[in-house]
């Protein structure tokens, strides 16, 4: 409520002559809320988007109808189209901020604008997602009590612009994030594998901070013992069985004691079959691990850390970009007796602070979240 939105009407002219959009009339329940008599030329064999700005003032479900009068070849035609809107009271919503100020993967980096499904799912639970386009937006959200969680996907090193100007977190941003978490805010960090750092421009420039190190700067600022590996998770066995790339993984080994897995369905007889089991999509992802008090990788998880998702028994770490990180030395963690596995998602709850969620891949992208 009381926030401007943009409704876009798309026209397509499949004829061999131009047309003129003479007017557009927007109405709700028979009441006109706006007209546009600008007059637009719709060229032959082309499309045209016409935006209309509207500010709803009440929380309700309603339908907006647009009526367009179009002239072509001395003939006038009238077309109508409707869209349903569910407007929520802005003051009663919980806010989640999504960082877009660091060429973040799936947000403003590679595969940009790919968190819409997550936003739709959140809206169903009266949660509003807000894209934070600048560092100033991110810092402001950290001190805004409306925001209960922040999501930071990996700052791209794949996008050409990101390779030219690789983004990292400023000291002010790190402090703001630490203060946000200390005040009870949830911080969600996602990594991406070093598949997407295996480029000459990166390998020849040691000054470029890798994605894992960049995200780990945040985890260090939060006081977390979790880290994202500078590696890639591969699985020769499961990828062959599924007929996909070695880094296109679907995991189904969960820690059922973690509240995030509540309600997840796993059929022990069909753990890899999506018809029976709800699988965790992990595309092009990295593993995660814990460090001890000295900052050294350890296979012993502190009591503050709770695993969420493990790799398969056949999943392994590989150092794709050959920078000496990742690979066989990456810590594994006990899933069951005589069954140690890579960890790909975990939470950490430090005393007096908000929850920290760490994943080796962006589990909230449109490719992972299926929602209407």
Residue ranges and their predicted role:
Residues 3-7:
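Structural beta-strand segments of beta-rich domains
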Residues 16-21:
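Short acidic/proline- and small/hydrophobic-mixed sequence motifs that coincide with surface turns
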Residues 50-58:
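Short, hydrophobic beta-strand segments
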Residues 11-15:
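Asparagine-centered strand-capping/turn motif at beta-strand->loop junctions
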Residues 40-46:
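Short proline/glycine- and polar residue-rich coil/turn motifs
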Residues 57-61, 67-372:
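Short, surface-exposed patches at the edges or C-terminal ends of soluble domains, predominantly
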Residues 27-34:
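Short, solvent-exposed loop/linker segments at beta-strand-coil boundaries, enriched for Pro/Gly
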């Amino acid at each position: 409520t009381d926030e401007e939105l943009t409704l876009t009407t798309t026209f397509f002219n499949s004829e061999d002559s131009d047309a003129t959009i003479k007017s557009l009339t927007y109405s709700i329940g028979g009441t006109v809320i706006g007209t546009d008599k600008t007059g637009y030329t719709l060229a032959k064999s082309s499309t045209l988007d016409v935006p209309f700005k509207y500010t709803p003032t009440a929380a309700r479900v309603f339908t907006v109808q647009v009526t367009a009068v179009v002239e072509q070849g001395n003939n006038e035609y009238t077309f109508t189209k409707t869209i349903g809107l569910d407007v929520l009271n802005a003051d009663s919503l919980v806010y989640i901020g999504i960082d877009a100020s660091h060429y973040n993967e799936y947000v403003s980096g590679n595969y940009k604008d790919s968190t819409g499904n997550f936003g739709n799912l959140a809206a169903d639970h009266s949660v509003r997602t807000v894209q934070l386009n600048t560092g100033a937006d991110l810092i402001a959200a950290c001190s805004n009590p409306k925001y209960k969680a922040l999501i930071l996907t990996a700052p791209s090193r794949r996008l050409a612009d990101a390779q030219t100007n690789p983004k990292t977190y400023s000291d002010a941003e790190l402090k703001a994030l630490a203060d946000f978490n200390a005040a009870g805010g949830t911080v969600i960090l996602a990594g991406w594998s070093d598949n997407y750092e295996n480029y000459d421009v990166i390998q020849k420039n040691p000054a470029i901070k890798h994605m894992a190190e960049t995200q780990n700067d945040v985890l260090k600022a939060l006081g977390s013992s979790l880290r994202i590996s500078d590696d890639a998770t591969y699985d020769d066995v499961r990828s062959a069985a599924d007929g996909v790339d070695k880094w296109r993984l679907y995991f189904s080994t969960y820690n059922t004691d973690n509240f995030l897995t509540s309600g997840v369905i796993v059929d022990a007889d069909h753990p890899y079959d999506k018809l029976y089991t709800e699988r965790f999509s992990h595309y092009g992802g990295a593993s995660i691990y814990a460090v001890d008090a000295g900052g050294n990788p350890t296979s012993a998880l502190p009591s503050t850390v709770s695993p969420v998702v493990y790799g398969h028994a056949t999943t392994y770490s590989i150092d794709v970009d050959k920078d000496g990180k990742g690979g066989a030395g990456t810590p594994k963690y006990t899933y069951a007796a005589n069954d140690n596995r890579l960890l790909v998602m975990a939470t950490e709850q430090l005393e007096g602070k908000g929850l920290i969620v760490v994943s080796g891949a962006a589990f909230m992208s449109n490719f992972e979240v299926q929602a209407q």
